[in-house]
A protein has these predicted regions:
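N-terminal amphipathic/basic leader segments beginning at the initiator methionine
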Residues: 1-17
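N-terminal extracellular/periplasmic Venus flytrap/periplasmic-binding protein-like
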Residues: 10-13, 24-29, 33-34, 42, ...
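Active-site pocket-shaping loop/turn-to-helix segments
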Residues: 14-37, 41, 59-62, 85-99, ...
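Conserved beta-ketoacyl condensing-enzyme motif
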Residues: 22-113, 117-134, 190-204, 297, ...
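Conserved catalytic cysteine-centered active-site region
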Residues: 57-111, 131, 143-150, 218-259, ...
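Active-site-proximal alpha-helical scaffold in enzymes
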Residues: 87-118, 156-186, 266-273, 360-381, ...
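Condensing-enzyme catalytic core of the thiolase-fold
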Residues: 179, 266-288, 304-312, 329-343, ...
Length: 403
């Protein structure tokens, strides 16, 4: 089978996902096009250099609707003969774009792809596209639907994680992210966002809160207690599904959950012939990809079974992995992953994660693949695994191996 190699990976800084965020003035198409242009410039791509642009995006309405991927191609300097494909696997959309591109290459359907994703959460509100699982009684009732924050608290309750553990993990994420920026660990991958006059709009992640302490987080109110206990009473729904739970321990709040931000990320993937034709050296190969469906109520446990699946399918064990990126959607997701595999925290999200820098839904999967590769190179390690939990009960994973 043909190998699929990563030749480059880059991302924009993440802006606060509010009207006062630095990227709020930039449209989804413009930011996507800016990143595609940067990828082409960095690798010297001209003409019909890639087979397709596969772009992950979750909230595909308004300016993010109508096949954003194709709109981005047309707004960029890429050749108009390059098509575009927008995909949505919720929070793993960016990863699924990369995985789909890699598997297309392995199957012989093209020599190279640009894959990644975007989410402009300040411009297109999360959930504004609707969701049948949340509003259709024919689906909501039999699946025991609860919002993601309740699901995160169910994980904490089921597996015994405390508020103190979650807050400590969040503080460490902030510390690691601040250190990574101070040591320029992201410099290789960051594409600054400029305005039409060439002036810098944003050149670093702006959501971070360096210096956050456990005492600071202890002052925050649990975000999902009211919707669980008062109206509409989702704790009751959870306990109907899991009658062994006497109550739900609400440990999550804004500080130990992922931040709402704007951002985009891209990965250039190609076969060996593509690299030789363009004078590019491969940085890593995509060794394996996987996705899986899980219980939709607890919803966010997907990283565990999908990691088991990808390791089994690739003939590997957890000990074969040097570094891990587990999306910090909520603290309990990462705590459960480390508990399930007895993985040292020293190997997981070593440069911080979404609790510190934010989670631009459609982009995050591609972001963590790029971050993982950069850190493997910095430490001169070989193999990394990236994984995300996914809304409605799914998981996705990618294993990369330096070459």
């Amino acid at each position: 089978m043909t190998e699929a190699y990563i030749y480059d990976a880059a991302r924009t800084p993440r802006g606060k996902g509010r009207p006062d965020g630095s990227l709020h003035e930039v449209t989804s198409v413009a930011l996507s096009a800016r990143l595609l242009n940067a990828m082409a410039e960095r690798s010297g791509l001209k003409g019909h250099a890639v087979e397709d642009v596969i772009w992950g995006n979750v909230t595909q309405v308004k300016e993010q609707g109508g096949c954003l991927a194709r709109s981005a191609v047309l707004a960029s300097n890429l050749d108009e003969s390059i098509p575009g494909l927008s995909i949505n696997r919720f929070c793993a959309s960016g990863m699924e774009a990369v995985n789909l591109a890699a598997n297309q290459i392995k199957g012989g359907a093209g020599d190279a792809y640009l894959a990644g994703g975007i989410e402009m959460m300040s411009r297109v509100g999360m959930g504004s596209d609707g969701a049948a699982i949340a509003v259709d009684p024919g689906l909501t009732f039999p699946t025991y639907f609860v919002p993601q924050g309740i699901s995160a608290d169910i994980i904490a309750t089921e597996y015994g994680f405390t508020r103190e553990q979650a807050d400590a993990l969040a503080v460490e994420s902030q510390r690691r992210a601040a250190q990574a920026w101070a040591e320029n660990r992201f410099a290789k991958s960051i594409v600054p966002v400029l305005d039409q006059n060439g002036l810098t709009i944003l050149d670093r992640d702006e959501y971070m809160r360096p210096g956050t302490t456990v005492d600071d987080l202890a002052k925050l109110k649990a975000s999902f207690a009211d919707m669980g206990q008062v109206m509409p009473g989702f704790d009751k729904v959870a306990m109907l599904k899991y009658p062994h739970l006497a109550e739900i321990n609400h440990i999550h709040h804004a500080g130990n959950s992922s931040g709402i931000v704007d951002g985009a990320a891209a990965v250039l993937i190609g076969n060996e012939a593509f690299g030789k034709a363009h004078g590019l050296r491969p940085r890593a190969r995509i060794r394996a990809t996987a996705k899986i469906g899980t219980d939709p109520t607890i919803m966010l446990t997907g990283p565990v079974p999908v990691t088991e699946k990808i390791l089994r399918d690739s003939g590997m064990s957890i000990g074969d992995i040097d570094l891990f990126e587990v999306n910090e959607a909520f603290a309990s997701v990462v705590l459960r992953f480390m508990q399930a595999f007895d993985v040292s925290p020293d190997l997981v999200n070593v440069n911080g994660g979404a609790m510190a820098m934010g989670h631009p839904l459609g982009a995050t999967g591609a972001i963590i693949i790029g971050t993982l590769l950069d850190e493997l190179e910095r430490r001169d390690l070989t193999t990394g695994l990236a994984t995300l939990c996914i809304a409605s009960g799914m998981g996705a994973a990618t294993i990369i191996e330096r070459v």
